[in-house]
Each structure stands twice: as structure tokens, then as C-alpha cells.
Amino acid sequence: RLFNNEYEYVDFDRNSYGGRVRFGKAISDWSSLNFRYRYENITIDQLKLAASEVFSQGTDEISSIGLGVTYDTRDNFINPSRGISTTFNIEESNDIFGANLFYTKYTADFAKYYSIKRNHTLSYKIEGAFIDFREIGDKIVVGERFYLGGPNNLRGFKASRISPRRLLSTGNFVRIGGNKYVFNTLEYLFPIALETGLRGILFVDAGNTYDESKNIDYNPIDMRKDVGFGFRWLSPMGPLKLDFGFPLGERKSGESKYEVQFSIGSLF
């Protein structure tokens, strides 16, 4: 699969192009192995607020191979009501494959779905990742670092706003991203108008990103949290998701009382 992406973060722009190849092999009724190759050319530019003090600006090349294992007993991939899904992946990018950005990345997730009664589903999901960068010099290479916030994780916050911060000489802060993160969510999906495919959802999210100076901390005080509600519609284009998230606890500068998130994807 080929791609060409442009993404504007708060403190920089990330532009990339490349491709991915993936193939898998079933090892049982519920388990599979997958192998991946990824090439991506990443350009970081438009640094803001003197962020060049800490960020490495320019172009990096990722050339990586990956191995993953999946165990999945869900009764439906788009709208599961029971079962579990868990994955573990490792990705290696180094000069052997032609990269100039060297790292090893580990990612894992686990989800459990409970059928409370007909068309009522409770789910819990936890995911996390760790990336070990090598030979990157004094400045931070942000292209592969982790940010939370947005429609796919902490829905009470703007996209990519949850991140460790670094103080600049100007007195401003920049979000440097984490080399690790953890995210949890508890969701309850219920019918509103089944004949049209419309459902409602209640959710609680908790998670955070951490830089090299900190370990992942499961202390609730250290995690950013939100609650909210939303709607799911199985449209002809696929599942549509509209969520209203409300952050809990003390808000930092630039954070709103609530966020509205829209996306297309699975119901959960």
C-alpha cells in the first residue's frame, strides 16, 4: 500500500510518503502471524516557537521489518459483542535495510467484549507502545514519537495534544512526544434506532505519554482522563463515529471544556 500523508502538529508539520507490504499466516483458528516491510520518507518542517532548539528538522528515512502475532476470538470485526482481541508487534528500522532513523518499536493491545444483553455491549481496551531510538544525536527526532488526543484515544482532548513538554529559552513550551505511552478505555454501546443502524455510546478514557526521563505510571493522578458520550451509525460508507469528550481534572493551557470528535472506522 502506497501513501502520501501531511499532518500538522501544534509545533511542527510532518509530511511523509512511502509504502507498506504485509502478509500473514494463520497458525490456528484464532491466531495468526504477520510479517511487514515499511518504507517511509519523513520531512519535519515549519517548526514553531523556536522549537528548533530541541527538534531535529529535515528528512529521515525509515526502512523497517516487523513481526506481529494476533489472537482474535471476536464474533464480528466491525461490531463485536463478545470475545477478545490481542496483538503484539515488534518493528526494527536500521541501516541494514537502508534507513537513517534507527529504532526498535514494541506495540501491544488487548480488548475484551461482553454481551450484557441483546445489542448491549460493554468493552474494555488497553494498548501501549515503547520505542527505543538509537544514534539520533542531541536533538529530538519527532517523526516516530507518540502523541495522544483525538478521536482514537483521549477523546476529551484535541488531536495529538497529550505529550511531554520541554521548556524553550523563549519561555514557551513545545510538545516533544513520548517514547512510550499507555491508553485505556471502557465503553458501553447500546441501541437507539436499530432499524437505521444508529447506536449510542458512553465512554471513559485514561492514558498518557512519557519521555525518556519517566517510566509508565499507572497512578490515576498521573494519567489524563475524560468521559463522554457519542453516536455510532453503520452507514453505507462504513461505521461513522461522533463523540463528545469532557476532560477530567485540571486543564492545561489551551485545553477546552469539551471536544467533538468525528471519524470513520469500527464501532468500538
Regions found by a protein language model. Give the residues of each.
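Gram-negative/organellar outer-membrane beta-barrel architecture
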Residues: R1-P80, I84-T87, L154-G156, S160-L167, ...
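Extracytoplasmic gating/loop element in the C-terminal half of outer-membrane beta-barrel translocons
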Residues: N119-F203, D211
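Transmembrane beta-barrel strands of outer-membrane/channel proteins
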Residues: R1-N4, F35-N41, I84-E92, A108, ...
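C-terminal beta-signal and terminal closure region of outer-membrane beta-barrel proteins
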Residues: S213-F268
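Transmembrane beta-barrel strand/turn architecture of Gram-negative outer membrane proteins
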Residues: Y17-F23, T86-N94, L101-R134
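Repeated loop/turn-to-beta-strand initiation elements of outer-membrane beta-barrel proteins
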Residues: D29-F35, D75-I78, K117-L122, L194-L198, ...
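Outer-membrane beta-barrel and related beta-rich outer-membrane complex signature
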Residues: I42-L49, R134-F146, E212-I216, G254
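Residues on the lipid-exposed face of transmembrane beta-strands in outer-membrane beta-barrel proteins
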Residues: V21-K25, L67-Y71, A108-K112, I126-G128, ...
